[in-house]
Amino acid sequence: MKPVVTGILGGSFNPAHGGHRRVSLFALAALGLDEMWWLVSPGNPLKPKAGMAPLAARAASARRQARRAPIRVSAIERELGTRFTIDSLRKLQRRWPKRRFIWLMGSDNLAQFVRWKNWRGIARLMPIAVIARPGYDSAALASPAMAWLRRFRRSAASIRNRAGW
């Protein structure tokens, strides 16, 4: 039996919008994912707190955007007691050891990925699918993170076929 493959899109979702939904539906199809999880972050250490809606409001906006789609909205990071992506992903893998996870991020995040805590550890922990975002692709391709991540490149077809897993 093949393991369930889950895409994870983390973020502030302040608010969630159609772009989050479109990216998720695209990734589900392109990568052959079984489901998508949206992790609504209690707080992003790289974003200012000013103007950030309460977690409950952001989770509610995410649930509205995720309706009638194989997208599960969760604020599990609060329960896990994690603040950084690397810690959240490690705990998710421990909690669901038979599940395969793929981290999704927009090219805007790849452009500044080196600012994330233990970003290389995230790449070693699970595959990362980078979704193009207009206006950010050049910066992402030229980023120090991309220079390091190139060694891990896989095609969407190899991920769909679970090659090397």
What are these regions (language model features)?
Residues 1-165:
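Nucleotidyltransferase catalytic core that binds NTPs
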